[in-house]
Amino acid sequence: MTIFNDKYMCMLELSGIYKSFFKQRILEDVSFTVASGEITGLLGPNGAGKTTIIRIINKIFTQDQGHVSFNGSLLTQKHIAQIGYLPEERGLYKSMTVEDQAVFLGRLRGMTKQDVKTALNYWLERFDIEDWRKKRIEELSKGMAQKVQFICTVLHDPELLILDEPFSGFDPINIELIRSELLKMKAAGKTIILSTHNMKSVEEICDRVVLIHKGRKVLEGNVKTLQNESKQGIYALTFKGNMIAFANALWVGYEIIDKEVHSDDLFTVYLKMRSENELNDLLNTVIPHVKIQKAAEVLPSMEEVFMQQINKEREEASHE
């Protein structure tokens, strides 16, 4: 069993996973770990192999090589009852009522009918949708059906929750609702994997990320650590004063790369350090000329971290 730190341990480990379909390599030597009690983002563009990885974890596909461990043991079919999986292709039986759908799926996960109804009561009340119980799925709006699908995924109280493109098609209200529930589940000790091509949608709630590109893992680590390792010396300064006076106060060690005009005398400017200067050097340069309201280093998004790594690999390959 892999120990991450004093608090968290490894729940899921993929080691040397290969998978091909019709002689086309889909996954190549994919290895990564998922820590217990954390939210891990499985990120990458469409077609990178993320869904294939998830289906291997759920025993829908079998890998050609490598192994998957769950809580220190080789993953077997018996572990699947401890996993909640929300696939990208949402699937509910439209003629069923919400309650019948929940009972059907809960029974597949080994729950008794009474346990399903008890859990369903809890989630319907939590989402303030108790009156949906006897509605048929076909009577629900898309957003309503999405809530039901999420409830059916977590009904059996899984140890590991895997959501494939979790916010795809959700309206902003439901996105915030699901995001809030995921954070509550994490606080309760659940382990969560969020798989998406939309890195911005999950980077704020992920503890760790695994970046997948063309069937290979290109990067893995703590979100803040990866962002700090990839930062480009860009700072955001919000100030009151004259924009021309601010620009004139700068010297060749700084480059203005963008700005936001909030009012006639309130601006946010994004600057890139051209040398080994630090934030204090920048502040000492401009404070005599404008009133600084906020100053902070800008960390790259996970999409920017991803592109930096891809460009680095391309450059290294071109020199081989």
Write out the residue ranges for each language-model feature.
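Helix-to-loop junction immediately C-terminal to a conserved catalytic motif
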Residues: 58
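ABC transporter nucleotide-binding domain
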Residues: 180-272
